[in-house]
Structure formats: structure tokens, C-alpha cells
Amino acid sequence: MNNLEVVFQLMALFFVLAAGPAVVVLVASQKGNL
């Protein structure tokens, strides 16, 4: 596995972890729950 693949996997993991809560907050705010 090259360094580029490791960096890409870390970026993908970070994106998933960051996008999960962001989507939940976005949907909640759209529904007016916040």
C-alpha cells in the first residue's frame, strides 16, 4: 500500500465522520427541531 492510498483512506474516513453529524444537524434544522 503506498502513502497516497493511506492518505486517501484517512481523508475518506475523516469525510465520513465529519459528514455524518453534519447531515443529521442539517436535516434536523430543516425540520425545525433545533
Swiss-Prot record:
Q: Tell me yes or no: is Ligase among this UniProt entry's keywords.
A: no
Membrane topology term reads: Single-pass membrane protein
User: Which is one Gene Ontology cellular component term of this protein?
Assistant: chloroplast thylakoid membrane
Q: What sections of the protein cross the membrane?
A: 6-26
Q: Does the keyword Chloroplast apply?
A: yes
| Principal place of residence | plastid
Record localization: Plastid, Chloroplast thylakoid membrane
Q: Which GO terms describe its biological process?
A: photosynthesis
What domain of life does the native source organism fall in?
Eukaryota
Keywords in alphabetical order, please: Chloroplast, Membrane, Photosynthesis, Photosystem II, Plastid, Thylakoid, Transmembrane, Transmembrane helix
Role noted for this protein: A core subunit of photosystem II (PSII), probably helps stabilize the reaction center.
Family, as annotated: Belongs to the Psb30/Ycf12 family.
Q: How does it assemble?
A: PSII is composed of 1 copy each of membrane proteins PsbA, PsbB, PsbC, PsbD, PsbE, PsbF, PsbH, PsbI, PsbJ, PsbK, PsbL, PsbM, PsbT, PsbX, PsbY, PsbZ, Psb30/Ycf12, peripheral proteins of the oxygen-evolving complex and a large number of cofactors. It forms dimeric complexes.
This chain belongs to the protein called Photosystem II reaction center protein Psb30
Q: Which organism is it from?
A: Stigeoclonium helveticum
